[in-house]
Amino acid sequence: AVASEGFKNKTDKSGKPYILHCIRVMQNLHTQDEELMSIAILHDCVEDKVCTIQELVAWGFSQRVIIAVGLLTHDQAVPYQEYIKNLSWNYDAVKVKLSDLRDNSNITRLKGLTKSDFDRMEKYHIAYTYLSKI
């Protein structure tokens, strides 16, 4: 409910409802682990200002979920590769980030490809390669 309500008016780069990205990230984990599924659904919520870590605590999410969502929240003041390294110690964050990177790298989701899209794909590829070796 947190993610679906928070992202109800947000669309992705192709104009589709943003919540579908979160659902695909969850589905692509191929798991029945409800906490891992929650992490996947919530992975962009704090970063995109849908909610705060404190609210997740108040709503009763487990420490496992809160820690992983916190690690998956990219503070823009932190360089991207440092952010990736910082989350790499947490199994749940790595699993969800790999699924997120796979979904974000799917160029069929984009309306058209620009130079910035190719640059972003290169950044994602470097992160995916690093995390997949963990």
Which ranges hold each PLM region?
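Active-site helical microenvironments for divalent-metal-assisted chemistry
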Residues: 1-134
